[in-house]
Amino acid sequence: MAVPPVTELTDRARAIFQLVVEGYLESGQPVGSKTLSQEQSLDLSPASIRSVLADLESIGLLAAPHTSAGRMPTETGLRLFVDGMMQVAEPTRAEREAIAQRLKRSGPIEQALEATSSMLSDLSGAAGMVMVPSREPRLAQISLVPLGQGKALAVLVGEDGAIENRVIETGDTPAHVLEQVSNFITARLAGRTLAEATAAMRKEIADGKSALDTASQNLVERGLAVWTEDAAERPVLIVRGQANLLDESALEDLDRVRSLLDDLENKQSVAELLETARDAEATRIFIGSENRLFALSGSSVIASPYRDREGKVVGVLGVIGPTRLNYARVVPMVDFTARSLGKLIG
């Protein structure tokens, strides 16, 4: 159903509609005319309120559950409220400082992403989601440092100063050969991504143009493979706080919650949904059936892209929960968290 403009509602209808939505988002329960009649700002009789509620229901903004005499917003109604009536509650100074400090203490980027997902879950009372950055950094050099007992520490340095290391098996390879292999790889990976460097070196070896002997060529393969395999196994999505979805109201609708938890297990599909927010200028809000993945579970997703220091979008983060999320609070919180995480991305 198309969302009617807010301006088409009378002042009375707009006021009652807003009170119903805000009451529902706060309590998770339908709001009745008796409750509304106690609002001093309305100064209307229960009969007048019931008449307006019926009108709002007839145009698809409210619905009356069979188990209650009250009304709750439909997905169409929630969209109208979010787009035209919601007053966002910006994070307080204390909340902003807490977010920044928690991210600073998180350590390497992988830990920062996990901390971000957990933090979004804690702040929203829903499940937090963070897509792992899809970017491939340019590399500067690799060093193979002998450790003894047939092992070496492979140290990979990026142009942005990031350092990663892995232990690889080297057999009885002498130290001077490790240095030769390090120089060979460094000369060919500088300024390239790992994928670009790997393709170039493997082609050079396959074409017989490499000056390395067979043992050294095998060592090159092992040195590259340890990162290639590791990258392939990295998760595309980090989800935390699924337990938040099992609140008291969830017990009344276990089928919906079970469907939502099943959907969250399909992380590739969730990541594809978040990808649709990658090019968004601002935080995106998907309400209920507006996204196909979570349509059956009646859930909402709030997502925002996060950028590196150069302003390039490298991932998306957000929260997912029931459609009665506190949008006014969660939307600016997701936006601020995305900007804070971006400051940590090189």
UniProtKB/Swiss-Prot annotation:
Name assigned to this protein: Heat-inducible transcription repressor HrcA
InterPro entries attached to this UniProt entry: GAF-like_dom_sf, HrcA, HrcA_C, WH-like_DNA-bd_sf, WH_DNA-bd_sf, WHTH_transcript_rep_HrcA_IDD
Organism of provenance: Erythrobacter litoralis (strain HTCC2594)
Domain of life of the source: Bacteria
GO molecular function: DNA binding
Alphabetic keyword roster: Repressor, Stress response, Transcription, Transcription regulation
Alphabetized HAMAP family for the sequence: HrcA (MF_00081)
Similarity comment: family membership: Belongs to the HrcA family.
Function in brief: Negative regulator of class I heat shock genes (grpE-dnaK-dnaJ and groELS operons). Prevents heat-shock induction of these operons.
One GO BP annotation of this record: negative regulation of DNA-templated transcription
